[in-house]
């Protein structure tokens, strides 16, 4: 299966049914950089990821970077139920946030962004460059290195984006998150509700300094 949304591709449009936080956005403005973070209330580490998004927003508050959160893959009986659940989740994880938060239950955003880029899990981060093209697709944790280069205009070389080399620490952190996600997803699949909490507690015993795991412990309690 080939990806139809790649680095350098024109960014798909923003098509949400509701803006739950922030001012509505109908399209990307040329000359601005956008960070678009896809999340879900059913994702084990999306809540701490949104907290990290808020920290990045604060760090780059003086730049022309816009931060957007999108919930586009929620499962519920009705769109109203899904929207209410997402709204409650945002209130819990990001109270009083001024980051734009959009909700789409039509499937268009999921199809045009996630499936088109072969991104089959959330959270997933996209960066839209000043010319309206996709500059980055990947993990939010990598934006500490990527975003300053996009802002400075040094991210592209000869018209091609270069993915930053991942340090050993970064690789370990990403692997930890993916292993955690796989274990929690498998537990939920068989309705073993105690297993996610057990996985978090085991992870904290192995890595007591992990803010990511401690946030998940809070979220699951």
From Swiss-Prot:
SUPFAM superfamilies: Thioredoxin-like. InterPro entries: AhpC/TSA (IPR000866), Thioredoxin-like_sf (IPR036249), Thioredoxin_CS (IPR017937), Thioredoxin_domain (IPR013766), Thioredoxin_ResA/DsbE_sf (IPR050553). Disulfide bonds join 43-46. PROSITE patterns: THIOREDOXIN_1, THIOREDOXIN_2. The keyword Membrane does not apply. Keywords: Disulfide bond, Nitrogen fixation, Redox-active center. GO terms for molecular function: antioxidant activity; disulfide oxidoreductase activity. Residues 5-156 form the Thioredoxin domain. Transmembrane segments: none annotated. GO terms for biological process: nitrogen fixation. Belongs to the thioredoxin family. This is Protein FixW. It comes from Rhizobium leguminosarum. The lineage of its organism: Bacteria, Pseudomonadati, Pseudomonadota, Alphaproteobacteria, Hyphomicrobiales.
């Amino acid at each position: 299966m080939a990806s139809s949304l790649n680095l350098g591709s024109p960014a798909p449009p923003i098509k949400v049914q509701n803006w739950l936080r922030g001012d509505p956005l109908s399209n990307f403005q040329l000359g601005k950089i956008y960070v678009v973070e896809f999340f879900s209330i059913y994702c084990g580490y999306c809540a701490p990821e949104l907290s990290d998004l808020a920290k990045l927003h604060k760090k780059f508050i003086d730049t022309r970077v816009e931060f957007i959160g999108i919930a586009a893959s929620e499962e519920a009986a009705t769109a109203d139920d899904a929207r209410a659940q997402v709204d409650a989740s945002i209130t819990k994880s990001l109270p009083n946030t001024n980051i734009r938060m959009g909700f789409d239950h039509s499937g268009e955003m999921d199809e045009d962004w996630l499936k088109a880029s072969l991104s089959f899990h959330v959270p997933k981060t996209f960066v839209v460059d000043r010319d309206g093209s996709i500059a980055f697709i990947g993990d939010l944790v990598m934006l500490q290195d990527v975003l300053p280069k996009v802002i400075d205009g040094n991210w592209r070389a000869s018209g091609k984006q270069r993915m930053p080399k991942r340090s050993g620490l970064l690789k370990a952190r990403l692997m930890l998150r993916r292993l955690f996600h796989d274990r929690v997803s498998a537990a939920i699949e068989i309705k073993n509700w105690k297993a996610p909490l057990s996985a978090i507690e085991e992870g904290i015993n192995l890595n007591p300094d992990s803010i990511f795991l401690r946030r998940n412990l809070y979220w699951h309690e």
